[in-house]
């Protein structure tokens, strides 16, 4: 299955509690999906940059273990988008569950 279209929503969800750097965002998604969703850097960072260009996340420089890192945090606009995306995903998920249950 291709979950690429859901990546922006998953990134926003990963950032809703606290800012994070890209690697940690990917790890959160992987852990919460029990390893099903494992996004690589080549997929994750373009999505983060698009979210930043769209004003849904913002980034800043920080340090972790003496190394510079770029951290991302969700904006108020991003929170609004996430709320809308959650509702749309629940509706879609329910419809698919109904259809698959008929098989």
Labelled PLM ranges:
Residues 1-2, 103:
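Absolute protein N-terminus
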Residues 52-68, 73:
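Beta-hairpin "wing" of winged helix-turn-helix
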Residues 44-51:
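Basic amphipathic alpha-helical segments that dock to polyanions
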Residues 2-43:
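N-terminal helix-turn-helix DNA-binding core of bacterial DNA-binding proteins
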Residues 27, 31, 76, 91-94:
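Generic recognition of well-ordered alpha-helical segments
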Residues 67-86:
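Basic, amphipathic "hinge/linker" alpha-helix immediately C-terminal to the N-terminal HTH DNA-binding motif
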Residues 82-103:
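Amphipathic alpha-helical dimerization/coiled-coil segments
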